[in-house]
Amino acid sequence: MRMTFGNMYSVEADRSKRLVVISAAGRVSKEEVKAAAQEVREIVKDFEPGFTVLADFRWLDSMDSSSAPHIGEIMDALAGKKVASVVRVIPDPHKDIGLNILSQFHYGPEIRTITFETLADALQSLSEESDE
């Protein structure tokens, strides 16, 4: 399942791998994040606890600061469905867009979050998780 919003934000799911992929590119607006939050809620509603999220922000230039509440909604939807881990790809730490701070409020200590600078490292981490 794949849904793309304005070519800036996309949400995909691979149920067989128990994986949700959230990608953002370019300049992302509040409206795009709001639409993505709704799509995340739809995609994860039938997921069993223990799935993984890959958040790919390699091509993100900027995100409206007013989108923070909708980022929180995405995190709450994932936490509510008992996501096991969130693996992020953020090549430039200056483009973190406050995800680490938001995570502290929306994810409990039982949700593992880890950030990588490269997609290759993130995929390696996901591969190691699936081997466990």
Residue ranges of each PLM-predicted region?
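Amphipathic, Lys/Arg-enriched alpha-helical "gate/interface" segment within cytosolic domains
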Residues: M1-E132
